[in-house]
A protein has these predicted regions:
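ATP-dependent carboxylate/phosphate-activation module, predominantly the ATP-grasp catalytic core
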Residues: 164, 172-173, 184-247, 271-296
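ATP-binding N-terminal substructure of ATP-dependent carboxylate-amine bond-forming enzymes
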Residues: 1-97, 359, 368-369
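Soluble, non-transmembrane catalytic domains of enzymes that act on hydrophobic metabolites at membranes
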Residues: 260-262, 268-317, 321
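Short acidic-hydrophobic, aromatic-tinged amphipathic segments that line or gate anion-handling sites
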Residues: 45-51, 126-129, 158-161
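A short glycine-rich, hydrophobically flanked beta-strand micro-motif that places a catalytic Asp/Glu
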Residues: 249-261
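Conserved ATP-binding module of the ATP-grasp superfamily
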Residues: 121-123, 143-145, 156-189, 218-221, ...
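Peripheral (often C-terminal) accessory segments that flank ATP-dependent C-N-forming ligase machineries
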Residues: 134-136, 294-370
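A conserved helix-loop-beta module that forms one wall/lid of the active-site cleft
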Residues: 88-156
Length: 370
């Protein structure tokens, strides 16, 4: 039985652990998040911050692992930079792309520049500082978004409608998050897409999932609180072309907006690791964690049958969406549809009692760290 260690936790860790456990793998996790540490899907847990890489390497030395999978951007970067050394010294394979590809997507400014240079559809974007406000406004216009180059969960993203707004906001964003960009505002607060793909070393897209995020928190632009798996071949092709130009090998998770005026798609970012909404793939028939293991160890891939139309709710923040959205009683799917054969939860697993209460605390934490 292969031993697989997850570097990090969160809801993505919970989903990955469930998927791996369902096909018989031994799952180890290093995280300080209790929601995963107490999960019935985890065989062995080390309670440690995800950034304690020295302790992680000590785990590999004393408790040999066959494969390491990152649950966060920082963990993905660390494993990508050190994958050759880790394999040589500890015998552990790191399920991450090579760093030459990885470094192009970790920084949002670098990735947007790459997209614009390679005719990949994306919003107009320019690096922003207190010294080039005039040039940035001329290039991008208003309304626009100030976006930190490195952040997660929509943190720090601020909409500005004029120069006064920009001047009032930029100082705080720079001091809190560091370097940032000014990006064209895509006017669509109703939904966005999340596209998950796996590209193997032969350049083949082995599997994909597209989810449409129809409720989010914060309400206008945030993490998914309700999404639906869909079929969208055009989106898959756009994202696959992007991965080809990046020479990407491995799993990738795209955020994509669609303009309301001309219906054009615009790639916003790539997350170089599995997302918190990964369970949307699992309930739709695609086991990405199993697929990753199979590809890494040259195990013949299974034929997955994708079944769209599955609804995944993140109840902890869907409650916050309900409290703040004016569409609480008109939303589709209905906010009050708690049960059904196609309704699942990102934070509650029927087969893991440890999640039956912890979902509430995770949702509250999301509220207070915004």
């Amino acid at each position: 039985m292969k031993k697989i260690i997850l570097l990090g936790g969160g809801l993505q860790g919970l989903s990955v652990a469930e998927s791996l456990k369902s096909v018989g793998y031994y799952v180890t996790v290093m995280t300080e998040l209790g929601t995963v540490l107490k999960s019935h899907f985890v065989d062995k847990a080390y309670k440690r911050p995800i950034t304690d890489y020295e302790f992680f390497l000590e785990i590999l030395r004393t408790d040999v692992q066959d494969l390491a999978i990152p649950m966060g951007d920082g963990a993905a970067e660390f494993l990508s930079k050190n994958k050759d050394l880790i394999r040589e010294k500890y015998g552990t394979i790191c399920a991450v792309p090579d760093y030459d590809s990885m470094k192009l997507v970790l920084d949002k400014d670098v990735f947007m520049s790459f997209c614009m240079q390679n005719d990949i559809p994306c919003p107009k974007t320019i690096s922003l500082s207190v010294l080039n406000i005039g040039e940035a406004v001329k290039r991008v216009g208003f309304p626009s978004l100030i976006k930190p180059n490195v952040s997660a969960g929509s943190r720090g993203i601020t909409k500005v409608c004029n120069v006064e707004d920009l001047n009032l906001s930029i100082g705080k964003i720079l001091s809190t998050y560091g370097a940032c960009t000014l990006q064209e505002y895509i006017d669509n607060q109703e939904y966005y897409y999340n596209v998950m793909l796996y590209r193997n070393k032969n350049g083949e897209i082995v599997a994909n999932t597209v989810i449409k995020i129809v409720r989010m928190h914060p309400v206008s632009a945030g993490s998914s609180s309700c999404c639906i798996s869909v079929v969208n071949d055009e989106l898959v092709q756009i994202c696959a072309d992007c991965l080809e130009k990046l020479k990407w090998v491995g799993f990738a998770d795209f955020d994509v907006l669609q303009r309301k005026d001309n219906l054009e798609y615009k790639i916003i970012e790539i997350n170089p690791r599995v997302p918190a909404s990964l369970r949307a793939s699992t309930i739709s028939g695609i086991n990405f964690p199993e697929l990753i293991v199979n590809d890494v160890f040259n195990i013949p891939q299974k034929k997955y049958v994708y079944t769209p139309g599955k609804i995944l709710r993140y109840l902890g923040i869907d409650i916050l969406w309900f409290l703040q959205s004016p569409k609480r009683f008109t939303a589709k799917p209905s906010w009050f549809s708690f049960f059904g054969r196609n309704v699942f939860y990102q934070d509650i697993y029927i087969n893991d009692p440890s999640t039956w209460i912890t979902w509430w605390f995770v949702g509250l934490k999301k509220l207070f760290v915004r």
